[in-house]
Amino acid sequence: MRQRFFAFFLPRWAAAAALALVFFGGVVPAALAAPENAAPAPAQRTPVGVETEAAPHDAAPAMPAAQGASGHGIKLFGTVEFRRPLSTLPGWLDVLDRNAQSPIFNPGRQFNRSTTWAQLSKRAEGKSPLEVLKLVNSFWNTWPYREDMANWGKPDYWAIPAQFLKKSGDCEDYAIAKYFTLKELGFPPGDMRIVVLRDTIRNLAHAVLVVYLDGEAYVLDNLSNVVQPHSRLRNYNPQYSVNENGRGTHIKGRQAGAVRPGGKRQ
Protein backbone atom coordinates (compact mmCIF):
# COMPACT_ATOMS: atom_id res chain seq x y z
CA MET A 1 0.00 0.00 0.00
CA ARG A 2 1.25 3.45 -0.83
CA GLN A 3 1.14 6.68 1.15
CA ARG A 4 -2.33 7.66 -0.06
CA PHE A 5 -3.80 4.27 0.90
CA PHE A 6 -6.05 5.73 3.56
CA ALA A 7 -7.02 8.76 1.52
CA PHE A 8 -8.94 6.43 -0.83
CA PHE A 9 -11.35 5.58 1.96
CA LEU A 10 -11.31 8.45 4.40
CA PRO A 11 -12.85 11.85 3.64
CA ARG A 12 -11.06 15.00 4.84
CA TRP A 13 -12.14 15.63 8.39
CA ALA A 14 -11.69 18.61 10.69
CA ALA A 15 -8.61 18.22 12.89
CA ALA A 16 -10.35 19.29 16.09
CA ALA A 17 -12.07 15.94 16.69
CA ALA A 18 -9.15 13.65 15.81
CA LEU A 19 -9.48 10.09 17.11
CA ALA A 20 -6.45 8.28 15.72
CA LEU A 21 -3.34 8.36 13.55
CA VAL A 22 -3.27 6.42 10.32
CA PHE A 23 -0.08 5.05 8.88
CA PHE A 24 1.12 4.40 5.33
CA GLY A 25 3.67 2.13 3.70
CA GLY A 26 4.47 -0.17 0.80
CA VAL A 27 4.93 -3.78 -0.14
CA VAL A 28 6.85 -5.67 -2.82
CA PRO A 29 5.09 -6.34 -6.16
CA ALA A 30 4.94 -9.84 -7.67
CA ALA A 31 4.28 -11.45 -11.06
CA LEU A 32 0.81 -11.22 -12.57
CA ALA A 33 0.12 -14.93 -13.21
CA ALA A 34 -1.22 -16.99 -10.31
CA PRO A 35 0.72 -20.27 -10.03
CA GLU A 36 -1.00 -23.06 -8.21
CA ASN A 37 1.39 -23.17 -5.26
CA ALA A 38 2.95 -19.72 -5.22
CA ALA A 39 4.06 -18.47 -1.81
CA PRO A 40 2.75 -15.19 -0.41
CA ALA A 41 5.10 -12.32 -1.18
CA PRO A 42 7.16 -10.75 1.61
CA ALA A 43 6.52 -7.15 2.50
CA GLN A 44 8.86 -4.33 1.53
CA ARG A 45 10.42 -2.57 4.49
CA THR A 46 9.79 1.04 3.63
CA PRO A 47 9.21 4.04 5.92
CA VAL A 48 5.68 4.80 6.92
CA GLY A 49 4.07 8.20 6.61
CA VAL A 50 1.64 9.59 9.17
CA GLU A 51 -1.51 11.63 8.74
CA THR A 52 -4.14 12.68 11.27
CA GLU A 53 -7.81 12.41 10.46
CA ALA A 54 -10.73 13.66 12.49
CA ALA A 55 -14.49 13.22 12.47
CA PRO A 56 -16.65 15.68 10.51
CA HIS A 57 -18.69 18.10 12.61
CA ASP A 58 -21.97 16.79 11.24
CA ALA A 59 -21.15 13.11 11.70
CA ALA A 60 -22.70 10.98 14.42
CA PRO A 61 -20.58 10.95 17.60
CA ALA A 62 -18.09 8.11 17.82
CA MET A 63 -19.01 5.68 20.56
CA PRO A 64 -16.98 2.85 22.11
CA ALA A 65 -18.04 -0.56 20.84
CA ALA A 66 -19.81 -2.77 23.34
CA GLN A 67 -17.87 -5.54 25.11
CA GLY A 68 -14.38 -4.29 24.25
CA ALA A 69 -13.02 -3.48 20.86
CA SER A 70 -14.95 -5.98 18.80
CA GLY A 71 -18.40 -6.34 20.29
CA HIS A 72 -17.39 -10.01 20.74
CA GLY A 73 -15.83 -9.48 24.17
CA ILE A 74 -12.38 -9.21 22.56
CA LYS A 75 -10.13 -6.16 22.48
CA LEU A 76 -8.69 -6.62 19.01
CA PHE A 77 -4.89 -6.39 19.17
CA GLY A 78 -5.33 -4.73 22.56
CA THR A 79 -7.36 -1.77 21.33
CA VAL A 80 -10.50 0.14 22.17
CA GLU A 81 -12.80 0.61 19.21
CA PHE A 82 -14.96 3.59 18.38
CA ARG A 83 -17.80 2.67 16.04
CA ARG A 84 -18.84 4.90 13.16
CA PRO A 85 -21.33 4.49 10.30
CA LEU A 86 -20.32 3.06 6.92
CA SER A 87 -20.95 6.45 5.34
CA THR A 88 -17.58 7.54 6.72
CA LEU A 89 -15.91 5.02 4.35
CA PRO A 90 -17.44 5.69 0.93
CA GLY A 91 -14.70 3.64 -0.77
CA TRP A 92 -15.89 0.52 1.07
CA LEU A 93 -19.47 1.20 0.03
CA ASP A 94 -18.18 1.31 -3.54
CA VAL A 95 -16.54 -2.11 -3.03
CA LEU A 96 -19.83 -3.56 -1.80
CA ASP A 97 -21.70 -2.12 -4.77
CA ARG A 98 -19.17 -3.32 -7.37
CA ASN A 99 -19.03 -6.79 -5.82
CA ALA A 100 -22.82 -7.11 -5.94
CA GLN A 101 -22.74 -6.25 -9.64
CA SER A 102 -19.93 -8.73 -10.48
CA PRO A 103 -20.43 -11.88 -8.36
CA ILE A 104 -18.04 -14.81 -8.75
CA PHE A 105 -19.57 -17.38 -6.44
CA ASN A 106 -21.45 -19.51 -8.96
CA PRO A 107 -20.74 -23.26 -9.30
CA GLY A 108 -19.01 -23.26 -12.68
CA ARG A 109 -16.85 -20.20 -12.09
CA GLN A 110 -13.18 -21.09 -12.64
CA PHE A 111 -11.04 -19.66 -9.83
CA ASN A 112 -7.69 -21.05 -11.00
CA ARG A 113 -6.48 -23.70 -13.45
CA SER A 114 -7.75 -26.59 -11.34
CA THR A 115 -10.47 -25.20 -9.07
CA THR A 116 -14.00 -23.99 -9.64
CA TRP A 117 -16.13 -22.42 -6.94
CA ALA A 118 -18.13 -25.65 -6.69
CA GLN A 119 -14.92 -27.60 -6.05
CA LEU A 120 -13.64 -25.15 -3.46
CA SER A 121 -16.91 -25.08 -1.56
CA LYS A 122 -17.02 -28.89 -1.71
CA ARG A 123 -13.58 -29.00 -0.06
CA ALA A 124 -14.99 -26.95 2.79
CA GLU A 125 -17.79 -29.42 3.51
CA GLY A 126 -17.38 -31.40 6.72
CA LYS A 127 -14.53 -29.25 8.00
CA SER A 128 -14.62 -27.42 11.31
CA PRO A 129 -14.98 -23.64 11.07
CA LEU A 130 -11.31 -23.18 11.96
CA GLU A 131 -10.28 -25.63 9.25
CA VAL A 132 -12.39 -23.68 6.77
CA LEU A 133 -10.52 -20.52 7.73
CA LYS A 134 -7.23 -22.29 7.04
CA LEU A 135 -8.52 -23.58 3.70
CA VAL A 136 -9.68 -20.18 2.50
CA ASN A 137 -6.58 -18.38 3.75
CA SER A 138 -4.13 -20.75 2.05
CA PHE A 139 -6.21 -20.92 -1.15
CA TRP A 140 -6.19 -17.19 -1.81
CA ASN A 141 -2.56 -16.88 -0.69
CA THR A 142 -1.53 -18.86 -3.79
CA TRP A 143 -2.13 -15.71 -5.83
CA PRO A 144 1.01 -13.54 -6.15
CA TYR A 145 1.23 -10.10 -4.61
CA ARG A 146 0.82 -7.21 -7.03
CA GLU A 147 0.79 -3.49 -6.29
CA ASP A 148 -2.12 -1.23 -7.12
CA MET A 149 0.06 1.01 -9.28
CA ALA A 150 1.06 -1.95 -11.46
CA ASN A 151 -2.53 -3.20 -11.66
CA TRP A 152 -4.56 -0.04 -11.86
CA GLY A 153 -2.15 2.84 -12.47
CA LYS A 154 -3.09 4.43 -9.15
CA PRO A 155 -1.53 4.20 -5.67
CA ASP A 156 -4.65 2.99 -3.87
CA TYR A 157 -7.44 0.76 -5.14
CA TRP A 158 -9.52 -1.86 -3.36
CA ALA A 159 -10.29 -4.67 -5.83
CA ILE A 160 -13.34 -6.92 -5.66
CA PRO A 161 -12.92 -10.73 -5.97
CA ALA A 162 -13.79 -10.71 -9.70
CA GLN A 163 -10.90 -8.33 -10.31
CA PHE A 164 -8.57 -10.23 -7.98
CA LEU A 165 -9.14 -13.43 -9.98
CA LYS A 166 -7.87 -11.70 -13.12
CA LYS A 167 -5.07 -9.50 -11.78
CA SER A 168 -4.38 -10.54 -8.18
CA GLY A 169 -3.70 -7.61 -5.85
CA ASP A 170 -2.18 -6.33 -2.64
CA CYS A 171 -2.88 -7.02 1.02
CA GLU A 172 -6.34 -5.48 1.31
CA ASP A 173 -7.43 -7.27 -1.87
CA TYR A 174 -6.53 -10.66 -0.33
CA ALA A 175 -8.55 -9.71 2.74
CA ILE A 176 -11.55 -8.70 0.63
CA ALA A 177 -11.47 -11.97 -1.37
CA LYS A 178 -11.32 -14.01 1.85
CA TYR A 179 -14.12 -11.98 3.43
CA PHE A 180 -16.59 -12.59 0.61
CA THR A 181 -15.55 -16.25 0.24
CA LEU A 182 -16.20 -16.96 3.91
CA LYS A 183 -19.49 -15.09 3.72
CA GLU A 184 -20.58 -17.43 0.89
CA LEU A 185 -19.52 -20.39 3.04
CA GLY A 186 -21.84 -19.26 5.82
CA PHE A 187 -19.73 -17.05 8.08
CA PRO A 188 -21.78 -14.03 9.26
CA PRO A 189 -20.40 -10.65 8.12
CA GLY A 190 -20.70 -9.45 11.72
CA ASP A 191 -18.09 -12.02 12.75
CA MET A 192 -15.53 -10.76 10.23
CA ARG A 193 -13.50 -7.58 9.92
CA ILE A 194 -11.13 -6.29 7.25
CA VAL A 195 -8.54 -4.59 9.46
CA VAL A 196 -6.19 -1.87 8.24
CA LEU A 197 -3.19 -1.73 10.54
CA ARG A 198 0.41 -0.78 11.06
CA ASP A 199 3.03 -3.54 11.26
CA THR A 200 5.45 -2.06 13.78
CA ILE A 201 8.22 -4.55 12.95
CA ARG A 202 8.18 -4.08 9.19
CA ASN A 203 7.27 -0.41 9.58
CA LEU A 204 4.53 -0.48 6.98
CA ALA A 205 0.80 -0.28 6.51
CA HIS A 206 -0.94 -3.61 6.03
CA ALA A 207 -4.40 -5.17 5.93
CA VAL A 208 -5.69 -8.54 7.12
CA LEU A 209 -8.98 -10.32 7.66
CA VAL A 210 -9.99 -11.05 11.24
CA VAL A 211 -12.65 -13.66 12.00
CA TYR A 212 -14.26 -14.01 15.43
CA LEU A 213 -14.80 -17.67 16.26
CA ASP A 214 -15.44 -19.49 19.54
CA GLY A 215 -14.36 -16.57 21.70
CA GLU A 216 -11.18 -15.89 19.73
CA ALA A 217 -10.16 -13.50 16.95
CA TYR A 218 -8.25 -15.30 14.21
CA VAL A 219 -6.06 -13.50 11.67
CA LEU A 220 -6.03 -14.45 7.97
CA ASP A 221 -2.92 -12.83 6.50
CA ASN A 222 -1.49 -12.90 2.97
CA LEU A 223 2.00 -13.00 4.55
CA SER A 224 1.38 -16.40 6.13
CA ASN A 225 -0.69 -19.54 5.63
CA VAL A 226 -0.84 -19.92 9.40
CA VAL A 227 -4.16 -18.82 10.88
CA GLN A 228 -3.43 -17.69 14.41
CA PRO A 229 -5.04 -15.74 17.26
CA HIS A 230 -4.67 -11.98 17.18
CA SER A 231 -2.88 -11.99 20.55
CA ARG A 232 0.19 -13.62 18.96
CA LEU A 233 0.69 -10.74 16.56
CA ARG A 234 1.82 -8.03 18.94
CA ASN A 235 3.45 -6.08 16.10
CA TYR A 236 0.04 -5.37 14.57
CA ASN A 237 -1.46 -2.03 15.55
CA PRO A 238 -4.95 -1.65 14.01
CA GLN A 239 -6.08 1.73 12.75
CA TYR A 240 -9.56 0.96 11.48
CA SER A 241 -11.70 -2.04 10.58
CA VAL A 242 -14.78 -2.56 8.47
CA ASN A 243 -17.45 -5.06 7.50
CA GLU A 244 -20.94 -4.72 6.04
CA ASN A 245 -22.35 -3.58 9.37
CA GLY A 246 -20.09 -0.67 10.20
CA ARG A 247 -16.65 0.77 10.61
CA GLY A 248 -14.47 1.05 13.70
CA THR A 249 -11.52 3.26 14.61
CA HIS A 250 -9.03 1.47 16.87
CA ILE A 251 -6.92 3.06 19.57
CA LYS A 252 -4.54 1.40 22.00
CA GLY A 253 -5.85 1.36 25.55
CA ARG A 254 -3.50 3.98 26.99
CA GLN A 255 -4.19 6.34 24.10
CA ALA A 256 -7.91 5.74 24.34
CA GLY A 257 -7.94 6.94 27.93
CA ALA A 258 -7.41 10.48 26.66
CA VAL A 259 -10.20 10.27 24.08
CA ARG A 260 -13.80 10.94 25.00
CA PRO A 261 -16.78 9.64 23.02
CA GLY A 262 -18.18 12.30 20.73
CA GLY A 263 -15.29 14.17 20.12
CA LYS A 264 7.84 -12.91 6.14
CA ARG A 265 6.02 -16.11 5.85
CA GLN A 266 6.13 -18.37 8.89
Predicted features by range, described:
Residues 2-6, 11-16, 25-266:
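A structural boundary/capping signal
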